[in-house]
Protein backbone atom coordinates (compact mmCIF):
# COMPACT_ATOMS: atom_id res chain seq x y z
CA UNK A 1 0.00 0.00 0.00
CA UNK A 2 2.82 2.40 0.88
CA UNK A 3 4.52 1.76 -2.48
CA UNK A 4 1.23 2.35 -4.30
CA UNK A 5 0.70 5.65 -2.50
CA UNK A 6 4.16 6.79 -3.61
CA UNK A 7 3.11 6.25 -7.22
CA UNK A 8 0.16 8.66 -6.99
CA UNK A 9 1.02 11.68 -9.17
CA UNK A 10 1.04 15.18 -7.75
CA UNK A 11 -0.55 18.13 -9.53
CA UNK A 12 0.93 21.61 -9.11
CA UNK A 13 -1.27 24.67 -9.50
CA UNK A 14 -0.28 28.30 -9.68
CA UNK A 15 -2.43 31.00 -8.13
CA UNK A 16 -2.12 34.57 -6.91
CA UNK A 17 -1.24 33.11 -3.53
CA UNK A 18 1.59 31.06 -4.91
CA UNK A 19 2.09 27.42 -5.77
CA UNK A 20 0.04 24.57 -4.36
CA UNK A 21 0.38 20.85 -4.89
CA UNK A 22 -2.31 18.18 -4.66
CA UNK A 23 -2.29 14.44 -5.14
CA UNK A 24 -4.30 13.65 -8.26
CA UNK A 25 -7.27 12.19 -6.36
CA UNK A 26 -7.61 15.26 -4.15
CA UNK A 27 -7.48 17.46 -7.24
CA UNK A 28 -10.20 15.41 -8.93
CA UNK A 29 -12.29 15.58 -5.75
CA UNK A 30 -12.38 19.34 -6.25
CA UNK A 31 -14.05 18.56 -9.59
CA UNK A 32 -16.57 16.36 -7.72
CA UNK A 33 -15.04 13.11 -8.98
CA UNK A 34 -14.71 10.14 -6.60
CA UNK A 35 -12.88 6.94 -7.49
CA UNK A 36 -13.95 3.51 -6.25
CA UNK A 37 -10.94 1.51 -7.31
CA UNK A 38 -10.21 -2.00 -6.07
CA UNK A 39 -11.85 -4.21 -3.49
CA UNK A 40 -14.87 -3.01 -1.55
CA UNK A 41 -13.99 -3.12 2.15
CA UNK A 42 -14.56 -1.06 5.29
CA UNK A 43 -11.60 1.25 4.64
CA UNK A 44 -12.60 2.03 1.05
CA UNK A 45 -16.24 2.39 2.08
CA UNK A 46 -15.37 4.90 4.81
CA UNK A 47 -13.32 6.99 2.38
CA UNK A 48 -16.01 7.02 -0.30
CA UNK A 49 -18.77 7.81 2.22
CA UNK A 50 -16.70 10.65 3.69
CA UNK A 51 -16.14 12.14 0.23
CA UNK A 52 -19.84 11.86 -0.62
CA UNK A 53 -20.79 13.64 2.58
CA UNK A 54 -18.17 16.33 2.01
CA UNK A 55 -19.40 17.05 -1.52
CA UNK A 56 -23.01 17.23 -0.34
CA UNK A 57 -22.18 20.76 0.84
CA UNK A 58 -23.18 21.80 -2.70
CA UNK A 59 -26.30 19.63 -3.17
CA UNK A 60 -27.32 21.08 -6.53
CA UNK A 61 -24.20 19.83 -8.33
CA UNK A 62 -23.87 16.14 -9.26
CA UNK A 63 -21.16 13.90 -7.86
CA UNK A 64 -19.39 11.60 -10.31
CA UNK A 65 -18.47 8.13 -8.99
CA UNK A 66 -16.00 6.27 -11.22
CA UNK A 67 -16.05 2.53 -10.53
CA UNK A 68 -13.38 -0.08 -11.28
CA UNK A 69 -13.96 -2.75 -8.65
CA UNK A 70 -14.09 -6.55 -8.36
CA UNK A 71 -16.57 -6.21 -5.49
CA UNK A 72 -16.07 -7.21 -1.90
CA UNK A 73 -17.85 -7.03 1.45
CA UNK A 74 -21.62 -6.68 1.25
CA UNK A 75 -21.90 -4.57 4.40
CA UNK A 76 -19.26 -2.14 3.15
CA UNK A 77 -21.04 -1.85 -0.18
CA UNK A 78 -24.41 -1.29 1.45
CA UNK A 79 -22.90 1.51 3.55
CA UNK A 80 -21.90 3.29 0.34
CA UNK A 81 -25.27 2.54 -1.27
CA UNK A 82 -27.18 3.99 1.68
CA UNK A 83 -24.97 7.08 1.73
CA UNK A 84 -25.53 7.62 -2.00
CA UNK A 85 -29.27 7.52 -1.37
CA UNK A 86 -29.04 9.59 1.82
CA UNK A 87 -27.29 12.66 0.47
CA UNK A 88 -29.17 15.31 -1.49
CA UNK A 89 -26.66 15.65 -4.32
CA UNK A 90 -27.29 13.30 -7.27
CA UNK A 91 -24.60 10.66 -7.82
CA UNK A 92 -23.71 9.82 -11.43
CA UNK A 93 -21.94 6.47 -11.87
CA UNK A 94 -19.52 5.29 -14.54
CA UNK A 95 -17.90 1.86 -14.88
CA UNK A 96 -14.39 1.92 -16.29
CA UNK A 97 -12.71 -1.47 -16.37
CA UNK A 98 -14.98 -3.67 -14.31
CA UNK A 99 -17.86 -3.51 -11.87
CA UNK A 100 -18.40 -6.91 -10.32
CA UNK A 101 -20.55 -8.04 -7.44
CA UNK A 102 -20.89 -5.01 -5.11
CA UNK A 103 -19.25 -2.94 -7.82
CA UNK A 104 -22.18 -3.56 -10.16
CA UNK A 105 -24.61 -2.97 -7.29
CA UNK A 106 -23.15 0.51 -6.74
CA UNK A 107 -23.06 1.17 -10.49
CA UNK A 108 -26.80 0.57 -10.86
CA UNK A 109 -27.50 2.65 -7.72
CA UNK A 110 -26.57 5.87 -9.49
CA UNK A 111 -28.97 8.64 -10.45
CA UNK A 112 -31.53 7.34 -13.00
CA UNK A 113 -30.48 8.41 -16.48
CA UNK A 114 -26.91 9.04 -15.30
CA UNK A 115 -25.52 5.50 -15.06
CA UNK A 116 -22.95 4.67 -17.71
CA UNK A 117 -20.09 2.39 -18.73
CA UNK A 118 -17.16 2.65 -21.09
CA UNK A 119 -17.33 0.40 -24.19
CA UNK A 120 -15.04 -2.39 -22.95
CA UNK A 121 -16.27 -2.48 -19.37
CA UNK A 122 -17.10 -5.83 -17.79
CA UNK A 123 -20.00 -6.14 -15.36
CA UNK A 124 -20.86 -9.10 -13.12
CA UNK A 125 -23.94 -9.79 -11.04
CA UNK A 126 -24.36 -12.73 -8.69
CA UNK A 127 -25.87 -13.64 -5.36
CA UNK A 128 -23.96 -12.75 -2.18
CA UNK A 129 -21.62 -15.34 -0.74
CA UNK A 130 -20.33 -15.93 2.75
CA UNK A 131 -18.82 -18.45 5.07
CA UNK A 132 -19.07 -19.22 8.75
CA UNK A 133 -17.67 -21.77 11.15
CA UNK A 134 -19.11 -22.62 14.51
CA UNK A 135 -22.00 -24.40 16.15
CA UNK A 136 -24.69 -25.81 13.88
CA UNK A 137 -27.36 -23.55 15.37
CA UNK A 138 -25.21 -20.46 14.74
CA UNK A 139 -24.49 -21.60 11.18
CA UNK A 140 -28.23 -21.78 10.54
CA UNK A 141 -28.65 -18.23 11.85
CA UNK A 142 -25.94 -16.97 9.49
CA UNK A 143 -27.43 -18.90 6.57
CA UNK A 144 -30.80 -17.24 7.20
CA UNK A 145 -29.11 -13.83 7.29
CA UNK A 146 -27.38 -14.45 3.95
CA UNK A 147 -30.72 -15.45 2.41
CA UNK A 148 -32.29 -12.23 3.71
CA UNK A 149 -29.42 -10.23 2.24
CA UNK A 150 -29.81 -12.03 -1.09
CA UNK A 151 -33.52 -11.22 -1.18
CA UNK A 152 -32.92 -7.57 -0.28
CA UNK A 153 -30.24 -7.11 -2.93
CA UNK A 154 -32.30 -8.91 -5.57
CA UNK A 155 -35.22 -6.60 -4.83
CA UNK A 156 -33.02 -3.50 -5.07
CA UNK A 157 -31.48 -4.62 -8.37
CA UNK A 158 -34.99 -5.15 -9.75
CA UNK A 159 -36.23 -1.76 -8.53
CA UNK A 160 -33.29 0.21 -9.88
CA UNK A 161 -33.15 -1.63 -13.21
CA UNK A 162 -36.86 -1.73 -13.97
CA UNK A 163 -37.07 -5.52 -14.23
CA UNK A 164 -38.93 -8.13 -12.25
CA UNK A 165 -37.66 -9.69 -9.06
CA UNK A 166 -37.82 -13.07 -10.80
CA UNK A 167 -35.57 -11.85 -13.63
CA UNK A 168 -32.81 -10.92 -11.24
CA UNK A 169 -33.35 -13.94 -9.04
CA UNK A 170 -32.66 -16.15 -12.06
CA UNK A 171 -29.92 -13.91 -13.37
CA UNK A 172 -28.03 -13.84 -10.09
CA UNK A 173 -28.32 -17.55 -9.33
CA UNK A 174 -24.84 -18.03 -10.82
CA UNK A 175 -22.12 -15.64 -11.92
CA UNK A 176 -23.45 -13.64 -14.87
CA UNK A 177 -20.88 -11.64 -16.76
CA UNK A 178 -22.10 -8.83 -18.99
CA UNK A 179 -20.64 -6.60 -21.63
CA UNK A 180 -21.56 -2.93 -21.55
CA UNK A 181 -24.25 -3.65 -24.15
CA UNK A 182 -25.74 -6.45 -22.04
CA UNK A 183 -25.68 -4.27 -18.92
CA UNK A 184 -27.61 -1.69 -20.94
CA UNK A 185 -30.22 -4.31 -21.87
CA UNK A 186 -30.55 -5.39 -18.24
CA UNK A 187 -31.06 -1.81 -17.10
CA UNK A 188 -27.94 -1.51 -14.95
CA UNK A 189 -26.85 1.46 -17.06
CA UNK A 190 -28.51 3.82 -19.52
CA UNK A 191 -25.54 4.84 -21.63
CA UNK A 192 -22.31 3.54 -23.12
CA UNK A 193 -19.81 6.38 -23.41
CA UNK A 194 -17.17 6.31 -26.13
CA UNK A 195 -15.93 9.89 -25.96
CA UNK A 196 -16.15 12.65 -23.39
CA UNK A 197 -18.58 14.63 -25.57
CA UNK A 198 -21.27 12.02 -24.89
CA UNK A 199 -21.91 13.68 -21.53
CA UNK A 200 -21.34 17.00 -19.87
CA UNK A 201 -21.20 15.64 -16.34
CA UNK A 202 -18.86 12.66 -16.27
Swiss-Prot record:
Q: Which residues form a coiled coil?
A: none
Instruction: Say if the entry is tagged with keyword Transmembrane helix.
Output: no
What keywords were assigned to this record?
A: Cytoplasm, Hydrolase, Protease, Serine protease
Task: Write out the GO MF terms.
Answer: ATP-dependent peptidase activity; ATPase binding; serine-type endopeptidase activity
Q: Specify whether Hydrolase is a keyword of the entry.
A: yes
Task: Fetch the InterPro entries from UniProt.
Answer: ClpP (IPR001907), ClpP/crotonase-like_dom_sf (IPR029045), ClpP/TepA (IPR023562), ClpP_His_AS (IPR033135)
Could you state one GO cellular component term attached to this entry?
endopeptidase Clp complex
The top EC class, named as a word, is: hydrolase
- Identify its protein family: Belongs to the peptidase S14 family.
**Which PANTHER family does this entry report, sorted A to Z?**
ATP-DEPENDENT CLP PROTEASE PROTEOLYTIC SUBUNIT
Instruction: Give the protein's biological function.
Output: Cleaves peptides in various proteins in a process that requires ATP hydrolysis. Has a chymotrypsin-like activity. Plays a major role in the degradation of misfolded proteins.
This chain belongs to the protein called: ATP-dependent Clp protease proteolytic subunit 1
Q: Which gene encodes it?
A: clpP1
